[in-house]
């Protein structure tokens, strides 16, 4: 203390700065916390899902796994790393159209997926059964997973094998619901032809509602009577009847 009394103010400030601890404890702790708590995507695909040790075995997965577990689980509705260049409706498929019945292979619709399952996970999971034409998760315009995916095999037998193996098997804690896409979708796309029994209502394509029978009154026709409407019109008399009435009237006037 006595030494500082003999020192100038600038020397005391320099001495105090040199005696301060280097680095910020709060910032360092935050960096250590962030490094230890957050895991990479490799642990999620390799060990977390397959039930093995994280980081061992690379991206291969032995079987559909139960859970990634821990704090490495991504938050729901996480945006994927890569979005498709051109968005299209999830139920739209360019294969439906002229010659859709000639489409070969087998197509599976996988639903009840965890929101963290990506396209790479689906491809990796089903590629062991055969060659894939397409395997993709459905996303909305915001990049959030819809929990469904399309898996298209080149051979229908491979699709049936995969459906038999994985249908109902939990993936990340949620059992997968796998269905084989058939021609029922085409039947749903066909226009419904209404059959009228005794003049029922028919709906022509691009037209308005009408009735099959021409004797039936249109909608709202003659339903409500306006002012003075609905009364029987006055009967018109012929010339002979008018002359007879005039003669009778003149006869009554003469007698009176």
From Swiss-Prot:
Residue ranges with Basic and acidic residues bias: 1-14
GO cellular component entries: cytoplasm; nuclear speck; nucleus
Keyword tags: Chaperone, Cytoplasm, mRNA processing, mRNA splicing, mRNA transport, Nucleus, RNA-binding, Transport
Basic residues compositional bias, start-end: 216-228
Stored CDD domains: RRM_THOC4
UniProt-listed Gene3D superfamilies: 3.30.70.330
Subcellular localization, as worded in the UniProt entry: Nucleus; Nucleus speckle; Cytoplasm
GO BP, one annotated term: mRNA export from nucleus
Bias type Polar residues, positions: 186-196
Pfam families: FoP_duplication (PF13865), RRM_1 (PF00076)
Superkingdom of this protein's organism: Eukaryota
The RRM domain, residue ranges: 106-183
GO MF annotation terms: C5-methylcytidine-containing RNA reader activity; mRNA binding
Positions of region (Disordered): 1-86, 186-256
Bias type Gly residues, positions: 24-58
Job description of the protein: Functions as an mRNA export adapter; component of the transcription/export (TREX) complex which is thought to couple mRNA transcription, processing and nuclear export, and specifically associates with spliced mRNA and not with unspliced pre-mRNA. TREX is recruited to spliced mRNAs by a transcription-independent mechanism, binds to mRNA upstream of the exon-junction complex (EJC) and is recruited in a splicing- and cap-dependent manner to a region near the 5' end of the mRNA where it functions in mRNA export to the cytoplasm via the TAP/NXF1 pathway.
Record-linked PANTHER family: RNA AND EXPORT FACTOR BINDING PROTEIN, THO COMPLEX SUBUNIT 4
Family (UniProt): Belongs to the ALYREF family.
Subunit details: Component of the transcription/export (TREX) complex; TREX seems to have a dynamic structure involving ATP-dependent remodeling.
The name this protein goes by in its record: THO complex subunit 4-A
Organism: Xenopus laevis (African clawed frog)
Encoding gene, per UniProt annotation: alyref-a
């Amino acid at each position: 203390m006595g030494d500082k009394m003999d020192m100038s103010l600038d020397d005391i400030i320099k001495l105090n700065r040199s005696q301060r601890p280097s680095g910020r404890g709060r910032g360092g702790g935050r960096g250590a916390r962030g490094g230890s708590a957050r895991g990479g995507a490799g642990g999620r695909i390799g060990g977390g899902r397959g039930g093995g040790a994280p980081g061992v075995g690379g991206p291969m997965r032995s079987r559909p796994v139960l859970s990634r577990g821990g704090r490495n689980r991504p938050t729901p509705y996480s945006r994927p790393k890569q979005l498709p260049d051109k968005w299209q409706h999830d139920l739209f498929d360019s294969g439906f159209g002229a010659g859709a019945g000639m489409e070969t292979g087998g197509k599976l619709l996988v639903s009840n997926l965890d929101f963290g399952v990506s396209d790479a996970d689906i491809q990796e999971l089903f590629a062991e059964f055969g060659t894939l034409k397409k395997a993709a998760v459905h996303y909305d315009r915001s990049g959030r997973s819809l929990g469904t995916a399309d898996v298209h095999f080149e051979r229908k037998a491979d699709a049936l094998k995969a459906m038999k193996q994985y249908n109902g098997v939990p993936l990340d804690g949620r059992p997968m619901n796998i269905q084989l896409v058939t021609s029922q979708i085409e039947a749903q796309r066909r226009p419904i032809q209404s059959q009228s029994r005794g003049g029922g209502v028919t709906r022509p394509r691009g037209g308005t509602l009408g009735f099959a029978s021409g004797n039936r009154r249109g909608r709202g026709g003659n339903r409500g009577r306006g002012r003075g409407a609905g009364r029987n019109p006055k009967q018109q008399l012929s010339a002979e009847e008018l002359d007879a009435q005039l003669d009778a009237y003149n006869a009554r006037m003469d007698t009176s």
